[in-house]
Amino acid sequence: YSPRELEYFRDGTNPELYPNVDWQNMAYRDYAMKHQVDFQFKGGSDRFKYYTTVTYANVSGLLNHTDMFSLYNSQLSNVQMNVRTNFDVKVTKSTILKLNLLVRLKEQKRPATAPSTLVQRLFDTPSAAFPVQTGTGAWGSTSVYNYNPIADIADRGTVKAIRRTLLADMTLRQELDFVTPGLYAEVTVAYDNMANYNDQRTRNYSCEMVTPVLDAEDNILGCTRQSLGTASELGWNSALNNLEMYSSLYGRIGYDRTFGKHAVDAQLVYEQLARVRNGRNSTMKRQSLYGVVSYDYDSRYNVDAVVNWSGTAVLAKGSRFNVYPAIGLGWTVSNESFLKNNPVIT
């Protein structure tokens, strides 16, 4: 630049031809907003108890120039709502029903220009490269850059990442003390569903390169204008990125009782799990039937034994099921009389 042109930058008399743009200040505001609301409900009686909590949070970002167009707002945002509900029902004196439910909705929004690209361009673009907008209202740029950081925020559309989560389970427990003390039966059914979506409303913007026309003494005679790029209409695209569904059935008959220094815990358990995901070869199923017996004497010596008949659909037919036995012995040395009052070993 000549001394005269440097003076144009300094005095700011022609910001279209000799701009001095603080891109960071133009792109960011000094504050972000967060709104959060929490509700809790609990109560019940001896036979019925409930607890529900609802949380809503909305966090917005630091970007400027996000509402220049009525079709969308490109501000960074993170909106989340959680609903959790627990119910305990005493059906009879010996029958208890429990229901747990969690629903989570989450939506994250950003400008269509990737955040890493936007930040890089804000740092890479010199203040004198081009104006934010030219005198005709077009986005400023040059053939060297072919982009405009503020247009990347305001005029590229938005991308939303949407996540939906449902977790639910129900347990029914029946005490069977009328048969023998310590005997019980329990069954649990659970279902989980998680999905991720992408919602894109994007378009391209065009820019204008303005070049000054100077005389021999660097006086401004006028300028030339050249269009860069081609603007497009706002398009829409939605895609399911990920889908996962889990279901399980868990049932057991158990016996848990203590006789003096003897403690016995025995269970016969049936377990069935299934997982389904989008895509090929993504289904998994597993089935198990196993028995567990634990014996403890005086909180010092214990024996655990298990026999598990288990199978999975991942393996080939004819080789899916097998028997897996195991046994374990334990000794709680710290409960021995010769160590109970030992100050070093506890």
Residue ranges and their predicted role:
Residues D46-R47, L62, S94, E175-A185, ...:
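Short loop/turn motifs that connect adjacent beta-strands in outer-membrane beta-barrel proteins
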Residues S45, Y56-S60, V103-K109, L167, ...:
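Transmembrane beta-strands of outer-membrane beta-barrel pores
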Residues V59-H65, Q108-A112, L122, M194-T202, ...:
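Outer-membrane beta-barrel proteins
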Residues P19-K42, S127-T142, R201-A316:
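Outer-membrane beta-barrel transmembrane domain signature of Gram-negative proteins
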Residues P3-N14, L62-N64, Q75-S77, N82-V83, ...:
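Outer-membrane beta-barrel proteins, especially TonB-dependent receptors
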Residues V37-S45, V83-V89, A168-Q174, G251-Y255, ...:
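Residues on the lipid-exposed face of transmembrane beta-strands in outer-membrane beta-barrel proteins
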Residues Y50-T52, L97-L99, L183-V189, V264-L268, ...:
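Transmembrane beta-strands of outer-membrane beta-barrel proteins
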Residues P15-T55, V59-L63, S74-Y147, G157-R164, ...:
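Flexible loop and strand-edge segments within Gram-negative outer membrane beta-barrel domains
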